[in-house]
């Protein structure tokens, strides 16, 4: 039986943490958790956790997860960058007012199990896709 601590202490070598001042590869979920506390304490502005190669789930590629503080609250704001299969440019989905544990769970699922949340109730924060979609896709709209 695998205990929580195994996943927690394990080093995920093909993942990196970027907090602005520094970035390093080979991360543990324990470090992720400590960084989340730092954000909540306003010692740190943001945290980006990214795989060396985007994670493919379904027909989407998941590029990175970013966490920052939810303004004026003790809570956290999380964003996930997603690219649809065959498309250029990512869509950034965001969710506000999440607790520490919820955010950690999302990141743990992503890193340890390559599982991602359903983004139906997340808002689109930024759409970085080129605006020429119908042209690129060709005859779909005819």
Q: Which residues are covered by each model-predicted region?
A:
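A short glycine-rich, His/Asp/Glu-containing loop-to-beta-strand
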Residues: 47-49
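Acidic, proline/glycine-rich low-complexity IDRs
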Residues: 1-44, 55-142
């Amino acid at each position: 039986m695998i205990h929580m601590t195994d996943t927690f202490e394990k080093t995920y070598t093909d993942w990196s943490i970027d907090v602005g001042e520094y970035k390093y590869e080979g991360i543990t979920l324990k470090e992720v958790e400590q960084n989340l506390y730092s954000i909540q304490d306003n010692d740190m502005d943001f945290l980006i956790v990214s795989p060396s190669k985007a994670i493919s789930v379904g027909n989407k590629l998941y590029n990175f997860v970013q966490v920052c503080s939810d303004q004026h609250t003790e809570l956290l704001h999380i964003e996930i960058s997603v690219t649809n299969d065959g498309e250029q440019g990512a869509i950034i989905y965001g969710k506000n007012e999440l607790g520490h544990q919820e955010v950690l769970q999302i990141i743990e699922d992503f890193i340890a199990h390559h599982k991602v949340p359903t983004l139906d109730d997340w808002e689109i924060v930024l759409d970085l896709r080129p605006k020429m979609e119908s042209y690129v896709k060709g005859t779909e709209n005819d």
